[in-house]
Amino acid sequence: RNIRSRGGGPGQFNYFQQIDVNEDTGLIFMLTTSGKINVYEMETGKFLYDIKIPDKETAQFAMLNDTLVATFMLNSSGQQKERIYISSQKENILNTFYRSDLFEVKSGTRWLMMSGIDRYMFRYKDLICYKEFYNDTLFVVTEKELQPRYIFDLGKYSIPIDCRMEACDGDWKTYNTIAAPYIRNQVIETDSLLFMPYNYWAGEKQRERHMVLYDKKAKE
């Protein structure tokens, strides 16, 4: 089936950033580059309605229900205090969750490290889960709060703030050296296991891909 078409009319889009799906209600949510989320019927591809999101630089999103949106913001400037907005179909911001790991970039330039496989939000059953690469905690996102679900203690492999690419202010040579000992991990949850793919931030081992499995029942 086709999901609408390119263009500027209702339900159309030029480009899209991400898709979310609610299999229970049979809806597809498409984050477009026009600041809207287009909603389509999964079975037919029919356009139903759109949802305006806050006029912010949204990196990713997840639907808490069919009209309530959680949008995630990257901290490319070092001073992006807001990390997640909860908003309604009419663009009203209902809640904001803040970050505390702020830093200064001397030049004032905004730097961004992001790839197409990065995933900050995912679904597990009826939960919306969220984890940043720079954060050791996986949260469950609700309208009212971020609920800690898992804490991943990376110990000596957790990257310090001043070793982040954004904090190095474009000095790739320095970054490639000081960030090399640290790892970044993602999380995928199933009923029995946590899958944690990881790789090093920089250096010779950056392209190597590793995987850790955690047995939820055995707790090991």
Segments from the language model and where they lie:
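Short beta-strand elements that form the blades of beta-propeller/WD-repeat-like
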Residues: 1, 26-32, 66-78, 85, ...
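Blade-loop segments of beta-propeller domains
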Residues: 1-26
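Surface-exposed loop/turn elements that mediate protein-protein interactions on large endomembrane-trafficking
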Residues: 1-5, 36-54, 81-106, 110, ...
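Repeated scaffold domains used in trafficking and secretory/extracellular systems
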Residues: 12-20, 55-64, 116-119, 182-185
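A generic tandem-repeat structural signature
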Residues: 18-46
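Long amphipathic alpha-helical scaffold regions
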Residues: 22, 56-72, 76-80, 158-171
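N-terminal regulatory/sensing modules of transcriptional regulators
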Residues: 45, 62-63, 68-69, 89, ...
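Long, internal scaffold/assembly segments composed of regular secondary structure
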Residues: 95, 106-123, 127-131, 142-143
